[in-house]
Amino acid sequence: MSAKLHITEIGRVAITAVDQDRALEFYVGTLGFELRSDEKFADGKMRWIEVAPAGGSTAIAIAPPMEGGPTAVDTGIVISTSDIEADHTALKAAGVDVDPEIARWGHPVPPMFRLRDHAGNSLTIVEPTQ
C-alpha cells in the first residue's frame, strides 16, 4: 500500500441492544459511564447512543440491531479497573450477570472477569498490572 492512512485512534466500538433505554440504564446507571450522545436518526425511527467511562477516550455506541443481525455477542470490549475485587463484588451485589470468580492466570495476563449486560452482550473487566 503506497498511500498513507490518517487513522488516529479507536474512537468507539458498537454493541447492539433491542431495548436501548434498558441498555442506557445499565451502562450509565450500573456501570457509571457518562452519556456522550443520544440522538435520533433515520427520520426519528432509530437512535444512536454513545457512553464511555468518565474521561475515557473510547466510547461504546449502543445501536439498534440490524435486521437479521445478532442481538447479543461477545463484544471483545475490555474495560480497565483500578480495583477488580471491589468492582466484582459490587456488580455481583447489584445483580449483574458476572463470572462467579475472578480469573487469575498469572503474568502476563491481568486478573479479569466477564460480565453480561441485559441483552447478553459480554464485556471483560481487567485490572492492568502496569
Predicted region positions:
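Vicinal oxygen chelate
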Residues: M1-H6, R12-I15, E39, R47, ...
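Helix N-cap motif at beta-to-alpha junctions
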Residues: D19-Q20, S82-E85
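Short amphipathic alpha-helices within nucleic acid-binding modules
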Residues: F26, E85-A90
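Short, charged/polar, Gly/Pro-enriched secondary-structure boundary elements
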Residues: G55-I60, G120-L123
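Core segments of cupin and vicinal oxygen chelate
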Residues: A14-S57
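Short, charged/polar surface micro-motifs in flexible loops or helix N-caps
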Residues: A54-T58, G68-P70, I84-A86
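Short glycine/serine/proline-enriched coil/turn segments at secondary-structure junctions
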Residues: A42-D43, G68-T71, H107
